[in-house]
Amino acid sequence: MARVTVEDAVDRVGNRFDLILLASRRARQLANGKEPLVETKNEKPTVIALREIEQGLIDNERLDIEDQAAQKQQDAEELRAVDALRGIE
C-alpha cells in the first residue's frame, strides 16, 4: 500500500479542505481515463492525484482550463450532431 504524506500538498494548496476538493477532482479525471502527469506504480487515482499536486503539476487553475476546453469540445460535437439531424429532415 502506498503511503502519501500530504503536508507538502497542503502547503501548495493552502488548506486541507481545498486539497480534498482538488485531489478528488483530479482523481476523478484519472479514474475516467486522463493520463497521469507522474510516473505511476500501480497506484490508485487518489494517490496519483496527491503526488501530482505535491509536485506542483496540478492546481485548480489548470483543472479549470482543462474542464473549459473539454466543455467547448463537447458543445461543438453536440452542435455538429444537431446540424446533422437538421440535414436529415
UniProtKB/Swiss-Prot annotation:
Record's keyword annotation contains Transferase: yes
InterPro entries, alphabetized: DNA-dir_RNA_pol_omega, Pol_omega/Rpo6/RPB6, RPB6/omega-like_sf
Catalytic activity of the protein: RNA(n) + a ribonucleoside 5'-triphosphate = RNA(n+1) + diphosphate
EC number(s) given by UniProt: 2.7.7.6
Keyword Transferase: yes
Keywords assigned: DNA-directed RNA polymerase, Nucleotidyltransferase, Transcription, Transferase
Superkingdom of origin: Bacteria
GO BP annotations, alphabetical order: DNA-templated transcription
Single Gene Ontology MF annotation: DNA-directed RNA polymerase activity
A GO term from the CC aspect: DNA-directed RNA polymerase complex
Top EC class of this enzyme: transferase
Pfam families registered for this protein in UniProt: RNA_pol_Rpb6
Function: Promotes RNA polymerase assembly. Latches the N- and C-terminal regions of the beta' subunit thereby facilitating its interaction with the beta and alpha subunits.
Protein family (similarity comment): Belongs to the RNA polymerase subunit omega family.
Subunit structure: The RNAP catalytic core consists of 2 alpha, 1 beta, 1 beta' and 1 omega subunit. When a sigma factor is associated with the core the holoenzyme is formed, which can initiate transcription.
Name of protein: DNA-directed RNA polymerase subunit omega
Organism: Idiomarina loihiensis (strain ATCC BAA-735 / DSM 15497 / L2-TR)
Gene encoding the protein: rpoZ
